[in-house]
Amino acid sequence: MKSLLSIAILILSTASLYSQSNNPKYDSTLAKKLGADNYGMKKFILVILKTGENKRSEKAYVDSCFAGHMANINRLVKINKLLVAGPLVKNEKSYRGIFILNVTTEEEAKELLKTDSAINEKLLEPEIYKWYGSAALSEYLDAADKIWKSTF
């Protein structure tokens, strides 16, 4: 009987080691505002921007397309559809930059990308991936806006 009781206690204590625990800092209001699931995560779209097929190099044309690209980035941030954007250092895969879009479907992402002049002119080519990450990602934008000194 003692050995049966010892085995039962061992099984129960082992099971509790692997069970989920609740977060004492959990803020249900914030989680709901950010669209978080029970794990504090949500679906996003990751876009990798590659060098496009358009090889035009006239400075005025390229500058105009990329000015539109930057204006579109700012517009998407203001409407809370773009959470992360930035260039990548030169690499052998011709990856130029990334976006993390605050949308859940590829169709929504494609609609947003249609508004980017550098993509429309095929100076950049997007690769679209579904991504699952922290729902709190959008919270960094307020801090990010307070730490830059100069614009590009």
PLM region spans:
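Conserved, structured core segments of small domains
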Residues: 20-152
